Each structure stands twice: as structure tokens, then as C-alpha cells.
Amino acid sequence: MLSRNVPKGDYLWGITRRIVDTNPGSDCVLDHVETNAMHRSARGALAVLLPLLLVASSARAQVPLPSSFVDAATVVDGLVLDMRYFGDHNFVGEKIDGYERPLCLLSAQAATALAEVQRSLAARGLGLKVFDCYRPQRAVAHFVRWARKIDDVRRKSEFYPDLDKRVLFEQGYIAEHSGHSRGATVDLTLVRRADGSELDMGGPFDFFSPKSWPSDSSVSVQAQQNRALLAQAMTRGGFRPYDKEWWHFTLANEPFPDTYFDFPVR
């Protein structure tokens, strides 16, 4: 066991020091030369072992991507990415925990199904643009912490102008778990393949309001038609919609219905 109050980088020297000091009443006393030699020996050992220990520590920190998950952009031809939680253009106003790269990770089954949707839209000159895919549980925890900070309303005007932040949990906008963490849910919209411009959906992604409900009739007729087109393409591809968010779809036959993953997006 290591001695207490020993700096992490000096743990070998801490062990050596304890060996020397454990029996102060002993007749065996190390002289100055022997002590210096011990110092040099310990430091030499540390110089050799520390890089190895750092590599081992790094390896433990590098949580591998499960073999059942893929980078959807390598499966879905022409998929447009706008990964909102990798940056600060989101309802929190900052990069979200767990998003280390702007990738769309999905279970292999969900990515394959999404590729079929993309192919079906190509005939119309349309394609898919994703905002979020797999979401680590630590990201959900970040949302929960933010929701409890009632005074943090940096993005209120853009994402929840008509909503009191204190009702986010009550009204279901924020929860302790998210289907995204199971790897088969995706937030997305439609774009024109010619120029990448988004179709009018009557409101932005992550807008906390009944106006985001797919059935909301207060948006323009064109927006209603575009929402219906997206929903039709996704349901035909094997996804089910969510009645509170026009952009949110989950693979009906998801492979991990009871598992909430927490590996980082990297």
C-alpha cells in the first residue's frame, strides 16, 4: 500500500521513503551515500515505468466503440451532419459531455435502415441531415444538471422562448434517460441534395414547444407537408416517430431496447 499524501507522479519514491522510515528505532541507519543511491535508483525506475503506466491509464480511458455500432456516415451515402451537441449551438449553449467528435454513431441495424431511407429520398432530389444520433448517458446527465440550474437561460430566446425552465422535467422535455443512448434513435430533417438547404419544417430542431409536435396545425401548410414527407419516409424505412418532436425517430426493431450506453462519441 502506498504512503498517504504522496503525489501521484512520485508514488515509487513514496514506497521507497516508507521502507526507510517504517522503523525509526532500528539500529540499521542508512548513511548519506546509501540514501542518495536509493534516490537515484527510485527515480531511474520511475523514469522507466511512468511512460508505461501512462499508456496503461490511457488505454483504460479509451472506451472502445462496441462492434455493433458504426459511423453512420460510412453507411449512409451523402448523409449531411450537423452534430449540435459537439458545439454550442444547442439549448444548453455549450459543448455537451461525451461528444468528442462530430460523428453520427448508430447501431449497425439503425444505420442500415437509415441508408434505405436515404436511397428512397434520392429519387425526389432530397436527402437526410442529422442533428444527433447515439447519445452517451453522460450527455443526458449534462442536460439534467443544466435543467436544474434555473438561472442558466442563455439560449432561452432561441429554443424555449415561451417556456418556464422550471417545467422542463414535468413536461417531458428533459428526462433522466434518453432513447438515443440505446443507439437506434436519430434526430434529423430533410435537405435538398442540390444545395444542402433544409426544407421548411415550421420550426427548428430542439424547439421546446407544442409547435414541434408533428401534428401541430399552426405551422404553414408547406411545413405540415414536409413533416409528413419526412415521417412517411422514416416509417417506411422501419422507424417509428415521436409525437412531441417532428425530427425524432427510433428504429422499431431496435437491437438494444433495454440498454443505455455511455461510451463517448469518438
Positions of the model-derived regions?
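Cationic, amphipathic, low-complexity segments that mediate targeting or membrane/lipid association
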Residues: 2-3, 21
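Extracytoplasmic cell-surface/polysaccharide-interacting catalytic and binding patches
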Residues: 60-133, 137-244, 253-266
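Bacterial N-terminal signal peptides
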Residues: 45-56
